[in-house]
């Protein structure tokens, strides 16, 4: 029996869940799971960690209600022991950088839930044929997470709520309570059922998707174009999605991405026009990449777009629009000192001299 088929929980026992990265989303998830009866612990750092240790996590909702949950919080994973689930709520490059730190939490049956934007490192686990077991260097250089964590532990996730940290230990809920989960092998396993049950017990909406990769791509479809275009132009989401020039660039990138995804079996349940119009309806939203650029934080360019280019090379799809925007966004990131986030990916460009 493999790890996907096993759940180490005793019936009626409390589920041990560690949220690795108790930021805006991770803290929100941890508080709601703890409220629902799971035994939750948090990995955090700095002033946020100190506030959680002192006062617990507070989640504030639009209707004025609050959830305050006290639980164990630390910056030292070895304090916590083996878990039933580890929810990794970090950005893709942070998850890669801290992969070794997760190992004290991993028992024989521990599942690792990946809550990153973009294509996950385990993506080709469970595939058959020519793509079976391919490892993506753009999000997992040298296969670090693949070897340290192991793809058999992975449960895929798509995250739809929006939250923000307003002060250490305090999270503001902006909208949404839906989460999607799925196994890389598409099975409705005991462990994914138990995870969904824990989310529902905490008042969250969780659903099993046998084709979780479809959900991952649908969310990525917008992120791969809107994020870098906004970072390059400084424009908010409504402008990027309605201006004829930037809308055209976004459409071209999405068309290329759709060709890539369809070659590896992905089905899109909406068309490009509907996806772009949906982004326009969000309004004057500053994308996460634009916010990161402005605040001097590392950008998720490899996980949102670099990996798409890598997959294009794997499936032999030409991507002129993606290549152009990626090259420009990389240079913007270098200029601002927020890229690369994976030094191993940086290659020396050929230098041409002109007399």
Q: How would you label these PLM feature ranges?
A:
Residues 7-62:
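NAD(P)+-binding Rossmann beta1-loop-alpha1 motif at the extreme N-terminus of oxidoreductases
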Residues 51, 105, 146-219, 225, ...:
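Internal alpha-helical scaffold of NAD(P)-dependent oxidoreductase catalytic cores
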Residues 35, 44, 99-102, 191:
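Flavin (primarily FAD) cofactor-binding/catalytic cores of flavoenzymes
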Residues 10-13, 239, 247-355:
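NAD(P)-dependent Rossmann-like dehydrogenase/reductase catalytic/cofactor-binding core
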Residues 66-166:
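Rossmann-like NAD(P)(H) cofactor-binding subdomain of soluble oxidoreductases
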Residues 17, 39-40, 112, 154, ...:
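Hydrophobic anchor at the start of a short beta-strand
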């Amino acid at each position: 029996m493999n790890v996907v088929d096993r759940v180490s929980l005793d019936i009626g026992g409390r589920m041990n869940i560690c949220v690795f990265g108790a930021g805006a989303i991770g803290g929100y998830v941890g508080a709601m799971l703890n409220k629902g009866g799971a035994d939750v612990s948090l990995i955090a750092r700095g002033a946020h960690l100190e506030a959680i240790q002192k006062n617990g996590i507070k989640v504030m909702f639009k209707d004025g209600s609050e959830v305050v949950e006290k639980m164990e919080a630390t910056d030292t994973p070895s304090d916590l022991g083996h878990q039933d689930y580890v929810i990794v709520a970090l950005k893709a490059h942070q998850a890669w950088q801290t992969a070794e730190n997760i190992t004290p939490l991993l028992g024989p049956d521990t599942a690792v839930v990946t809550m990153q934007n973009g294509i996950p490192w385990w993506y080709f686990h469970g595939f058959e044929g020519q793509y079976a077991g391919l490892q993506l260097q753009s999000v997992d250089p040298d296969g670090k997470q693949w070897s340290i964590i192991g793809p058999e532990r992975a449960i895929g996730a798509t995250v739809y709520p929006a939250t923000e940290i307003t002060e250490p230990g305090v999270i503001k809920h902006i909208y949404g309570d839906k989460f999607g989960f799925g196994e890389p092998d598409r099975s409705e396993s005991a462990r994914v059922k138990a995870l969904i049950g824990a989310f529902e017990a905490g008042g969250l909406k969780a659903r099993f998707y046998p084709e979780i990769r479809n959900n991952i791509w649908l969310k990525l479809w917008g992120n791969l174009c809107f994020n870098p275009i906004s970072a390059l132009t400084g424009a908010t989401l409504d402008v990027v999605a309605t201006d004829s020039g930037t809308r055209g660039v976004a459409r071209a990138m999405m068309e290329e991405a759709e060709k890539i995804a369809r070659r590896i079996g992905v089905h899109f349940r909406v068309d490009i026009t509907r996806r772009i119009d949906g982004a326009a309806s969000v309004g004057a939203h500053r994308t996460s990449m634009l916010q990161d650029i402005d605040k001097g934080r590392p950008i998720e360019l490899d996980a949102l777009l670099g990996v798409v280019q890598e997959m294009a090379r794997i499936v032999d799809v030409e991507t002129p629009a993606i290549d152009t925007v990626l090259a420009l966004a990389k240079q913007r990131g270098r200029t601002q000192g927020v890229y690369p986030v994976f030094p191993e990916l940086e290659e020396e460009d050929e230098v041409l001299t002109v007399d």
